[in-house]
Amino acid sequence: MLQWIKKLSLTPIYLAFILIWAYFAVYAGSLLAYLGLGVLLLRLFLTYPFKKSLAALAFLSLFVLFFLLRREMAEQAIRQEPPSASSVQVLPDTIKVNGDSLSFRGRTDGRLYQVFYKIKSASEKEAFQQLTDLVVLAIEGEFEQAQQQRNFSGFDYQAYLKSQGIYRTLKINKIQSLRPISSLNPLDWLSVWRRKALVYIRNNFPSPMSHYMTGLLFGDLDTEFAEMSDLYSSLGIIHLFALSGMQVGFFLDGFRRILLRLGMKRETVNALQLPFSFIYAGLTGFSVSVVRSLVQKLLAQQGLTRLDNFALTLMVLFIIMPNFLLTAGGVLSCAYAFLISMMDFEKLPPIRKLLAESLTISLGILPILIYYFSEF
């Protein structure tokens, strides 16, 4: 991809900026997005030679066609009524038990659903809390539409599920049987490994240590954490539970350092980092912030830095996680990465550098926080 961009004689960040406007024009369909995209394309043809502009437009059109295809597939999935549910495969690392309420993500007929069930007994609750295997439930249930936004600035649960590739919820009325299964899908393996680790930590470590471990290592915050979130916020440590590029860099650098000290060639280590990154992303639930950090780290090892690195990261994410900018978490993660890529305070004294970086990030992210949460 980078070689194609170099042939266009355009900076990658400029193409990425146009792609962001095209992305929101396709997915949001707002007048502002169309207007911004039109202005940028007009400037493209006015600034660069016609042939280069045409080549850039062809390159951008490939992404736009991909966006349109994904949007149409999503719209078809929303319109199409699913058949009646008789069984559902449980993704074990998504299991959440809150009182007598059970929720998880499940797969049936090749589609992903958010599943809800009212637990009937204490033994059933304990069984699901300790469940770590891949299972299929024989059920009686019905599909429903997720709740939309009910008030101004309220949470739009339906839009959130749509951004996760989920277009219906499944309400289970009765579980008839539970059957363990095996799978050849690596994503299922990662789900099982992650679930086993989460259950082990919660069974063997006290609170709040277990919260730290599941949050920092696996990106999972359970219902017990929600009850303590106000306390953590008042102590000023709530941010410690969010996986960030710092943790990703720590694990990747550690993995790389160990292999190099074992005498492996640098080329071999670079190749092994790809499957390691995939496994690590799976163990953290493929969160946008982790995947974005991993992609940036891998590109940095290929010599791409700062804005070129950020631009190529966006383009890769557009392909592997097309919905990443449809959530507040995705927007915030990329905004932080952009601000860090833009900052250059190396010539300042240490204290002034720290203050300048903190102020730049805080002010830069403020409009996004106000837009999504009406607070900061």
Question: Positions of the model-derived regions?
Answer:
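N-terminal leader/targeting segments
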Residues: 1-79, 169, 292, 317
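Membrane-interface helix/helix-cap signal primarily in integral membrane proteins
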Residues: 2-4, 63-239
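Short linear sequence motifs
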Residues: 16, 27, 59-60, 97, ...
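A residue-level signal for conserved active-site and pocket-lining positions in enzyme catalytic cores
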Residues: 21-22, 216, 329
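Hydrophobic alpha-helical transmembrane segments in multi-pass membrane proteins
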Residues: 29-34, 39, 45-58, 170, ...
